[in-house]
């Protein structure tokens, strides 16, 4: 149930193509993989950075969760997701420790990732991710 790594860092953006070009130029990233994320009504682009992913999220709809976040907070850092070996066990441990989470359980992320939003810590939205069912490249 230990944390395994920084799984991914999300940035919320208005224009996905513009953001990809900017992140590639400024950070020297090779390329982004663009993926539809229908359960969040967003389009995402991800690029590998060491053992982690840098993810850009562009809402398709202002009423989606990412759309509401963008409207309230503007573009920029969105969330930090930490990898775990067993998400369901970790959520059960948090519950038994009396720690409330945003999500009642895990939900589907992109590419077979299982995720759960655990709320904000000192202003940063935090999430846990279990990608043990995903292909190792995912």
Specify the residue positions occupied by each region the protein language model found.
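Short coil/turn motifs at helix boundaries and re-entrant loops, enriched in small/polar
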Residues: 8-10, 53, 72-90, 122-125
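N-terminal beta-strand motif that seeds the catalytic metal site of vicinal oxygen chelate
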Residues: 1-21, 77-82, 132-138
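A cross-kingdom feature marking solvent-exposed beta-strand/loop segments within repeated
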Residues: 5-7, 26-41, 60-78, 93-115
